[in-house]
């Protein structure tokens, strides 16, 4: 906590909390990844200082990319176990978000929404190319609009990811506007009842792009039964569609929370339990071991 003295015009640090985690062995840095069209995507990477770029590191790519929301760099305590076991945590500011203002947002909305997914794929490919990881050790995670991003990239590039965590997602983009408050998102995604929007939405709608005979990455889809924003039907029907695909060999799981909504209404203890479940899924899928 910092106080400002209006008379002396001086700043004074009056209180500082001790960090709850020992981060002395962790390094974080920002890099820029070239998108398909030459745009520079800001990417934050956190990992242990002794990391070797040998292509064998379990890596989690976190994405959102929508509604002009800026996802600021963060290091949640819940990721510390993953990183301390040799994992790499990556946060990518893909287009559709607000990292560089409204223009950055506009380049990833409506008819340009595919740009959000192309940026995510570009970052994933860069991580592999720079030997942080490999497709066999790479996972992608996102919630809400970020869940849509996850659903899109795993259906478009299932070969690029080993696993995915898809939280409270939109996945049926042809009927999304018919449920709950989603009609208010038409300015962001487009109106499926209009022919031009219908065409671009159908091209990337994850539910409509589950291909027969194609095995999607091992995935945990998380939804809340009382979600008042994104109807849990998206998660339920998507998982059912994938599980009915005879070519789906990897586990594709639905985790329903019958006591919560869009990530809200949970006690601290419930959030800890849920995050523990997700991270155990992640570590099992990426074969993370160790006791740190």
Q: Predicted segments — roles?
A:
Residues 68-74, 99, 233:
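Glycine/threonine-rich flexible loop motifs
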Residues 57, 64-69, 144:
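Active-site glycine-rich loops that stabilize anionic/oxyanionic intermediates
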């Amino acid at each position: 906590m910092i106080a400002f003295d209006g008379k002396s015009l001086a700043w004074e640090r009056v209180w500082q909390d001790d960090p709850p985690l020992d981060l002395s062995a962790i390094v974080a840095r920002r890099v820029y990844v070239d998108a398909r069209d030459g745009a520079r995507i800001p990417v934050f990477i956190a990992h242990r200082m002794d990391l070797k770029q040998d292509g064998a590191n379990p890596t989690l790519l976190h994405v959102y990319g929508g509604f002009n929301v800026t996802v600021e760099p963060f290091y949640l305590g819940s990721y510390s176990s993953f990183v301390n076991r040799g994992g790499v945590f990556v946060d990518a500011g893909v287009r559709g978000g607000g990292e560089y203002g409204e223009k950055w947002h506009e380049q990833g909305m409506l008819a340009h929404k595919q740009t959000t997914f192309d940026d995510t794929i570009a970052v994933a490919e860069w991580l592999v190319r720079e030997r942080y990881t490999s497709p066999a050790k790479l996972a992608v995670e996102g919630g809400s609009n970020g869940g849509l991003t996850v659903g899109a990239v795993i259906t478009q590039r299932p070969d690029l990811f080993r696993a995915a965590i898809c939280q409270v997602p939109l996945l049926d983009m042809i009927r999304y506007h018919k449920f709950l408050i989603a009609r208010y998102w038409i300015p962001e995604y487009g109106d499926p009842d209009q022919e031009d929007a219908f065409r671009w939405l159908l091209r990337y709608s994850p539910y409509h792009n589950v291909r027969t005979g194609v095995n999607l990455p091992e995935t945990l889809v998380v939804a809340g039964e009382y979600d008042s924003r994104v109807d849990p039907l998206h998660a339920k029907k998507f998982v059912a569609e994938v599980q009915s695909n005879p070519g789906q060999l990897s586990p594709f799981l639905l985790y329903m929370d019958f006591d919560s909504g869009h990530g809200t209404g949970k006690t601290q203890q419930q959030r800890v339990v849920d995050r523990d479940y997700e991270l155990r899924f992640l570590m099992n899928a990426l074969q993370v071991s160790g006791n740190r």
